[in-house]
């Protein structure tokens, strides 16, 4: 399972809110030897795959042409809407 991701340069609460208005959501990749990376993902791509067990076993994120193997560590969902607010990924 592969998803395209973009590195975020604009960080913070306001930037995250603006990002969510464009049908994307913020996420972070951490773990391993590399430094943590803030990314953005397209909501429609991810939400359609979250009900499959393979999603939680490990996925591939394509960031600037480089593939990174990750596993979802934490998912923050909207209280009553079927939306993802933020995700944490751990490098595998």
Swiss-Prot record:
HAMAP family: Ribosomal_bL25
Entry similarity comment: Belongs to the bacterial ribosomal protein bL25 family.
GO molecular function terms listed in the Swiss-Prot or TrEMBL record: 5S rRNA binding; structural constituent of ribosome
UniProt xrefs under PANTHER family: RIBOSOMAL PROTEIN L25/GLN-TRNA SYNTHETASE, ANTI-CODON-BINDING DOMAIN-CONTAINING PROTEIN, RIBOSOMAL PROTEIN L25_GLN-TRNA SYNTHETASE, ANTI-CODON-BINDING DOMAIN-CONTAINING PROTEIN
UniProt keyword RNA-binding, yes or no: yes
One biological process term in Gene Ontology: translation
Protein name (Swiss-Prot/TrEMBL): Large ribosomal subunit protein bL25
Assembly notes: Part of the 50S ribosomal subunit; part of the 5S rRNA/L5/L18/L25 subcomplex. Contacts the 5S rRNA. Binds to the 5S rRNA independently of L5 and L18.
Matching InterPro entries: Rbsml_bL25/Gln-tRNA_synth_N, Ribosomal_bL25/Gln-tRNA_synth, Ribosomal_bL25_short, Ribosomal_L25_dom, Ribosomal_uL5_bac-type
Protein function: This is one of the proteins that binds to the 5S RNA in the ribosome where it forms part of the central protuberance.
Record keywords: Ribonucleoprotein, Ribosomal protein, RNA-binding, rRNA-binding
GO cellular component: cytosolic large ribosomal subunit
């Amino acid at each position: 399972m592969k998803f395209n991701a973009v590195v975020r340069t604009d960080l913070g609460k306001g930037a995250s809110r603006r990002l969510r208005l464009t049908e994307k959501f913020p996420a972070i990749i951490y773990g391993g030897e590399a430094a943590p990376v803030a990314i953005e993902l397209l909501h429609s791509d991810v939400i359609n795959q979250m009900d499959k067990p393979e999603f939680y076993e490990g996925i591939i994120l394509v960031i600037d042409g480089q593939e990174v193997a990750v596993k979802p560590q934490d998912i923050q969902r909207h209280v009553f809407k079927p939306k993802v607010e933020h995700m944490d990924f751990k490098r595998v």
